[in-house]
Amino acid sequence: MAEFKRLLAQLCCDEKQEEELLSYASACGNDGADGLVLIDNAKTDEEHEFHIGLIRKMARAIDIPIFAGGRVKRLEDVKKYLYAGAKGVFLDVSVEENVDMIKEAADRFGSEKIFIRLNDAAQTKRIPEYAQLGASMAFLGEEVLPEAAEVIRTMEEQMHYYVMSSSGETEALAKELK
C-alpha cells in the first residue's frame, strides 16, 4: 500500500470573521489542502445557524471536502451540517450524549459521514466501541496521540485517523503512529 499524508486545514468559526474565513477556506483549497475541518464553537442557536450558512457558502466556493462539528446537540445538527455541504460530521466524544448519538447518526446518514473527535487520552480506550457504533474516522488531538498509537495500529482496518495539530509538529506526530 502506498503511503501518503493528507493535509486537513483546521479553522474555528467566529461570526465576526465571515469574509476572512471564506478567504482562508479558498486559500486552503488553492494551496493544496485535502480537506477543511470546521469547528463550530457557537454558544447560541443564532451563532450556530450562522455557521451552518458559512458551511453552505464554503461548500459552494471550494472544491475540497468540509468536515464540520463542534456544536452537535441533537441529530438535527448532524443533518444541518450535511445538508449545508459538509462531507462528514464529527462528534466530540467527550460529551457522552454524542457517544449515544453515533449509532443513530451512522444508521441514518451512513457511517462514512460520521466521525469522532478525541481530545482526551482516556477516550482512546473506547475507540473500538466508537467504531462498533458506526464512526468511520477519528480526528485526534495531538495531546492524545501517544496513548492512541497502539489502539490505532490494531484498529486501522476499521477506522481512518487524522491528527489535528495546532503546533505544527505534524512530522513528529506522524512518526508516533508508525
Language-model features, listed with the residues they occupy:
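Conserved short-loop catalytic and cofactor-binding motifs
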Residues: 42-46, 69, 90
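Catalytic cores of alpha/beta
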Residues: 61-89, 123-133, 149-178
